[in-house]
Amino acid sequence: MARFFRRRKFCRFTAEGVQEIDYKDVATLKNYITEAGKIVPSRITGTSAKYQRQLARAIKRARYLALLPYTDKHQ
């Protein structure tokens, strides 16, 4: 019987020693939003609570400044 090995999630920002998540770094922020434009929860990404709050704030600022879309579901 095959057992599935689930890889341990870790916070990328803690591992890299990031002080503050920058709202102008759109390439990084795009990794943490879905195709529909929603913010991916930390239980999926493994981001720590401190950086999840910074991430949410940075994504919301980038949306407000039109660096990121609020949604991609325009028809």
UniProtKB/Swiss-Prot annotation:
Keyword list, A-Z: Ribonucleoprotein, Ribosomal protein, RNA-binding, rRNA-binding
InterPro entries: Ribosomal_bS18, Ribosomal_bS18_CS, Ribosomal_bS18_sf
Residue ranges that the Swiss-Prot or TrEMBL entry lists as coiled coil: none
Any GO BP annotation: translation
One GO CC term, this protein: cytosolic small ribosomal subunit
PROSITE patterns per the UniProt record, alphabetical: RIBOSOMAL_S18 (PS00057)
Family: Belongs to the bacterial ribosomal protein bS18 family.
Physiological role: Binds as a heterodimer with protein bS6 to the central domain of the 16S rRNA, where it helps stabilize the platform of the 30S subunit.
Subunit structure and binding partners: Part of the 30S ribosomal subunit. Forms a tight heterodimer with protein bS6.
Protein name stated in the entry: Small ribosomal subunit protein bS18
